[in-house]
């Protein structure tokens, strides 16, 4: 009887730990698609191109922590429109992989380029608003954007 109770209690403990542990670890983990959204999506977008837009956005989105990210592009379109690129023209990515897609239409974007004399921790960026085609890498199930590859 004592052995049965021990087995039942052990089984319950394993069950509880199995349920609790993944949620503790998983909550702070960012999926590739969530990382793409954080780094590249700004649906609201700048209504007017402000010279400080990139400095503020790069800082707010955590891309100047520990180093200055040299280049980043923000897309000012709906998530649905950006996700739809994953079913558009397939092209080869810069790294040679075949999971990139080129947008059929131009997108409203802002390119942030680290200025040459800028050094961490003071990351200064030039801000350039454009309408260009974008090349986006997609992955997963569902097939969603995971990497901004290029502007063309």
Swiss-Prot record:
SMART domains: RNAse_Pc (SM00092). Substrate binds at residues 35, 38, 69-73, 94. Residues 1-25 form the signal peptide. Residues 27-43 have a biased composition (Basic and acidic residues). Its EC number is 4.6.1.18. GO terms for cellular component: extracellular region. It catalyses: an [RNA] containing cytidine + H2O = an [RNA]-3'-cytidine-3'-phosphate + a 5'-hydroxy-ribonucleotide-3'-[RNA]; an [RNA] containing uridine + H2O = an [RNA]-3'-uridine-3'-phosphate + a 5'-hydroxy-ribonucleotide-3'-[RNA]. The active site is at residues 40, 147. Keywords: Disulfide bond, Endonuclease, Hydrolase, Lyase, Nuclease, Secreted, Signal. The keyword Lipid biosynthesis does not apply. Disulfide bonds join 54-112, 68-123, 86-138, 93-100. Residues 26-48 are annotated as: Disordered. GO terms for molecular function: lyase activity; nucleic acid binding; ribonuclease A activity. It holds the Pfam family RnaseA. GO terms for biological process: defense response to Gram-positive bacterium. Its main location: secreted. It is found in: Secreted. The keyword Glycosyltransferase does not apply. Endonuclease that catalyzes the cleavage of RNA on the 3' side of pyrimidine nucleotides. Acts on single-stranded and double-stranded RNA. Belongs to the pancreatic ribonuclease family. Monomer. This is Ribonuclease pancreatic gamma-type. It comes from Rattus fuscipes.
């Amino acid at each position: 009887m004592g052995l049965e109770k021990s087995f039942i209690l052990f089984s319950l403990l394993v069950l509880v730990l199995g349920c609790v542990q993944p949620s503790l670890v998983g909550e702070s983990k960012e999926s590739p698609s969530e990382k793409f959204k954080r780094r590249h999506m700004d649906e609201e977008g700048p209504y007017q191109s402000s010279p400080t837009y990139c400095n503020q956005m790069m800082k707010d989105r955590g891309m100047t922590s520990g180093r200055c990210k040299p280049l980043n592009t923000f897309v000012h379109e709906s998530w649905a429109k950006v996700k739809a690129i994953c079913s558009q023209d397939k092209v080869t990515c810069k790294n040679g992989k075949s999971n990139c897609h080129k947008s059929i239409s131009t997108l409203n974007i802002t390119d942030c380029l680290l200025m040459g004399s800028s050094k961490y921790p003071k990351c200064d960026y030039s801000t350039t608003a454009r309408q260009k085609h974008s090349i986006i890498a997609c992955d997963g199930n569902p097939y969603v954007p995971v990497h901004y590859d290029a502007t063309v």
